[in-house]
Design a protein with these regions (language model features):
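Glycine-rich phosphate/adenosyl-contacting loop at the front of the ribokinase-like
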Residues: 1-58, 67
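Conserved N-terminal subdomain of the carbohydrate kinase-like
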Residues: 50-100
Length: 100
């Protein structure tokens, strides 16, 4: 049994991209892009596992994004339990302006 179990009620796929500059009304020319598993409990379990302790992340997952979330968590080698849901797992988007 795991010593730490996290429960994430609203997990997400965290999408991060970088742009040279953000200008009102202008298209963003994105460079690179990264997708990571996200949500409070998922992140806590990832850190605990990286520090060498035993943890398992429990979270709902649905739709295409839910399947991707499960793949991303598995890619890191972490233990997890995905609870199937009818809805779609959310995706959030962060833009880093390199110029600032």
């Amino acid at each position: 049994m795991s010593s730490i179990v996290t429960l994430t009620m609203n997990p997400a796929i965290d999408v991060s991209i970088a742009v040279d500059r953000i200008a009102s009304g202008a298209k963003l020319r994105c460079q690179g892009g990264e997708r990571d598993p996200g949500g409070g409990g998922v992140n806590v379990a990832r850190v605990v596992q990286r520090l060498g302790a035993d943890a398992v992340a429990v979270y709902p997952a649905g739709g295409v994004m839910g399947a991707l979330l499960q793949q991303l968590v598995a890619r890191e080698g972490g233990r997890s339990v995905a609870v199937p849901i009818a809805g779609e797992t959310r995706e959030d988007f962060t833009v880093l302006e390199k110029h600032s």
